[in-house]
Amino acid sequence: MANESTNILYTVKEAAGILKTNVAYVHRLRQSGKLRFIKIGQFKVRKETLENFLKEFEGCDITDPFKVIQL
């Protein structure tokens, strides 16, 4: 059975708040495939997915999610 944190879902707005960015940028991350979402009425991302995203791109410039640059 999945642990409690894998069941937590964030909206795009909540994910933007966690990442300290704006909703439009989170949609760009989704469109680029860098951050995977599920659509249940509106787009949502799992807490675990968001945490893995931060680990995966640590040390990178992802200002443009279509052109990731290693720092």
Question: PLM features: residue spans?
Answer:
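Major-groove DNA-recognition helix of helix-turn-helix-type DNA-binding domains
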Residues: 18-44
